[in-house]
Amino acid sequence: WERKKCFTLSTCRLAFYYVLKSLKLKKGDEVILTPIQIPDFVNAILNLGLKPVFVEVDEKTKCLDLDDLKRKINDKTKVVLATYLTGIVPDINKIQKICDENNIFLIEDISQSYGSSHNFKKAGTFGFAAIGSLSPAKIISSVGGGFILIDDKKTIDEISHNFENELSLPEKKTLLKICIFQLKVSLLTSTIIFNFFSFYLF
């Protein structure tokens, strides 16, 4: 991706949290997203004193419905999260235009769309920032992890500052649990075992 900075973290939910935190939004400011999200994304919004606002899912793209997005935007709307649930990148230029016209930060969640593009431009390069997951079952997996892609220097400095003051190395026990879980997933999804359980038992 042609972005100036890539931060790596333990999860995508932390990536989302720290992007939001770096924006220094006011209590009660609104973050628009679709209702098909992991609970911790909503928790990240609430933990920062912000308000989640849900927008309908577009039937074709499974991303934000543009008409409902326009209806839900108001003076308190500060962030729009565009999640590409099925790997399909919608007409993100239209979403970006709506955000630009209303001084809203657009964050892309590209966890399911690595390598996807719109008009020959890669997903993750349209918004103010992009986040992604590297957890099991994702297109690219590193046992666990998440990342932030961003260009804005002020925000990069703010995120770096927050990392230095708030994050610490994980405990060995935690890493061991993650590795054991990933080993189980790898075994259960191996060709022989997966075929046995999915074909012969059903």
Regions found by a protein language model. Give the residues of each.
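Conserved N-terminal alpha-helix of the aminotransferase class I/II PLP-enzyme fold
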Residues: 1-14, 36
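Conserved PLP-anchoring active-site segment centered on the Schiff-base-forming lysine
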Residues: 19-72
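Short acidic capping loops at alpha-helix termini that bridge into adjacent secondary structure
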Residues: 4-5, 27-30, 76, 157
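Buried hydrophobic packing segments
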Residues: 15-20, 146
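Structural motif of enzymes handling amino- and sulfur-group chemistry
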Residues: 151-202
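Active-site phosphate-binding strand-loop segment of PLP-dependent enzymes
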Residues: 60-161, 165, 169, 173
